[in-house]
């Protein structure tokens, strides 16, 4: 019986000795440059590997698009999503980072001086043609920006994920 107990205790000890502590990945602060169309110098055409190198703390990676999902690297806790196959970023209302200029929460009526007239206008969003491609701004019922998308594509070629 002692032998059995010693063998059992040895196995438990060996298994716990193999357990390793792993440090969680820490990301640098997210910095969005609206006028240049980048996030920490990453552009909408950046590949998943480039994004992972700068931001190793993603919450989900989808390598290949499917019928129900677009490929990309996602940071749900930071409310920022990189859709790599469609070449755009999406920044939500709970974004944890800096946006320059600080558009999140800005009034729809205050954008003309900065962005000019939108190329496409809808009730709840505007699409602006930028030097890098397209900036799409979404508005809440109060007319304040609550989501934005930065794409390397023109408004005519833009395809967004659902």
Regions found by a protein language model. Give the residues of each.
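Short helix/turn-capping signatures at newly exposed starts of structured segments
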Residues: 18-123, 140-162
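Sec-dependent N-terminal signal peptides
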Residues: 4-13
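Extracytosolic low-complexity repeat regions of secreted or lipid-anchored proteins
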Residues: 123-132
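Low-complexity, intrinsically disordered Gly/Pro/Thr-rich segments
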Residues: 131-139, 143
